Amino acid sequence: MKIELQNRQQRARAVYRGIASFYCLLCISLVILYAIRHDAYHLSVSLGALAFPIALPLVWKLPFLKRVWSLDCLILGFVFLAYPLGSCVDLFYWLPGYDKVAHTLSGTFVSLLALILYYCLKPGHAIGRRDKALATAFMILASIAVAGLWEIGEYALAGVVGRDLQRVAATGVADSMQDMIVCTLGTIAAIPVSLRLSDGKKGVLSNMVKDTICLHFGEQTETQGV
């Protein structure tokens, strides 16, 4: 099990480096472009995006954390779609439907993080079939809560950046409601990961969750039947 975990993390490390390299190259190019254009808003957003792959490794240096490369791939991959592509390239504005795709994926993304959090909080941290219902309910409710908080954040930030982030002028409350609906759909799409994990079945995402728990809490996280 330990060798298998190490092999998965080595492969994930190579994938992460590829994602991070392309991420940084795009952000640097955008910083130069927006500096030439004197576009202060997009320049600041691009600089902020460039800081993320620098900050992420620093988080793992906290004494109670151990780096999980497969989790890094998930985090940076989602941030890349939402931040450099969505906000810096401005696909949220230029590509119809991109905003809804991002919100759908955010539901899946947050659900997986919530599933990891569930097993981190669970006494003993063991992964077993008895967790199916509670773990799944936890990830669903956590994801929906984050979706609501995100919309509150957009509402608060709109006055600061001077942009109609929720498209209230054009859609009223429809855009915010649709965002939360598609986020919930993305959450539902992640339910099979929780079920497969509880049953001890392997998969890219279920392995990522299991590896994260195992690296932090040890072999007691092996799937246990009841």
Sequence positions of predicted segments:
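Membrane-interface helix-boundary motifs at transmembrane edges
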Residues: 9, 38, 58-71, 125-131
